[in-house]
């Protein structure tokens, strides 16, 4: 009771004062049973292969392949975090429009990965370019580096396609 004799109302329940998060993807391990969860897993696997292959080629053209490494490693880590947020169920506790965040994330990564794929393809196409190093003409990429870069280009394309499929699914969820 207050000093005036009127009863004091109970404090509001915080669970009732916050709106529910907007997400149509399931939380927990059920995310892995959806197409979106499967694509995120493929993005992680193929994206990891891209940066491992680029790193194993000893990065002969750092100006081009440095961006490919940055994009592939950043997307790999962010996709792991994205999947971890859904697997842990945090999406049900944070009030956010997760459908829009899913769309915005996949749109951004798709654009950057498409650029990285083009740069990796450009690097691979320089295989026959010869450079003059003190009177000895050598190819810019050795045969081993060329083969590794071909594989990295293929996996960069596959990863870009996976991000594109995830983008399409996210767009359908965000704009029904």
Swiss-Prot record:
Which InterPro entries does the entry link to? Answer: MAL (IPR013295), Marvel (IPR008253), MARVEL-CKLF_proteins (IPR050578)
Sites carrying sugar chains: 132
Q: Tell me the keywords, alphabetical order.
A: Cell membrane, Glycoprotein, Membrane, Transmembrane, Transmembrane helix
Positions in the Lumenal compartment: 56-66, 124-149
- GO molecular function terms attached to this record: structural constituent of myelin sheath
Gene Ontology CC terms, in alphabetical order? apical plasma membrane; membrane
Per the record, the domain of life is Eukaryota
Name the major location.
membrane
What sequence ranges are listed for the domain MARVEL?
A: 31-175
Q: How does it sit in the membrane?
A: Multi-pass membrane protein
Q: Which GO terms describe its biological process?
A: myelination
Instruction: Report the subcellular localization.
Output: Cell membrane; Apical cell membrane
Cytoplasmic-side segments: 1-34, 88-102, 171-176
Query: Where does the chain cross the membrane?
Result: 35-55, 67-87, 103-123, 150-170
The job of this chain, per UniProt, is described as:
Member of the machinery of polarized transport. Required for the indirect transcytotic route at the step of the egress of the transcytosing cargo from perinuclear endosomes in order for it to travel to the apical surface via a raft-dependent pathway.
Assembly notes: Interacts with TPD52L2.
What the record says about family reads:
Belongs to the MAL family.
What is the designated name of this protein? Protein MAL2
Q: Which organism is it from?
A: Bos taurus (Bovine)
């Amino acid at each position: 009771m207050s000093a005036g004799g009127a009863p004091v109302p109970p404090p509001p329940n915080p669970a009732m004062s916050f709106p529910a998060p907007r997400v149509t993807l399931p939380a927990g391990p059920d995310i892995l049973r959806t197409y979106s969860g499967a694509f995120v897993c493929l993005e992680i696997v193929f994206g990891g292969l891209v940066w491992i292959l680029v790193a194993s080629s000893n990065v002969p053209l750092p100006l081009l392949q440095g961006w490919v490494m940055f994009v592939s490693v950043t997307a790999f880590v962010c996709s792991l975090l994205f999947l971890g947020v859904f697997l842990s169920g945090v999406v049900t506790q944070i009030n956010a429009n997760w459908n829009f965040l899913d769309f915005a994330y996949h749109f951004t990564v798709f654009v950057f990965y498409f650029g990285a794929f083009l740069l990796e393809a450009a690097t691979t196409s320089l295989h026959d370019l010869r450079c003059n190093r003190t009177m000895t003409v050598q190819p810019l990429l050795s045969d081993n580096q060329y083969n590794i870069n071909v594989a990295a280009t293929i996996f960069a394309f596959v990863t870009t396609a996976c991000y594109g499929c995830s983008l399409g699914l996210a767009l359908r969820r965000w704009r029904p």
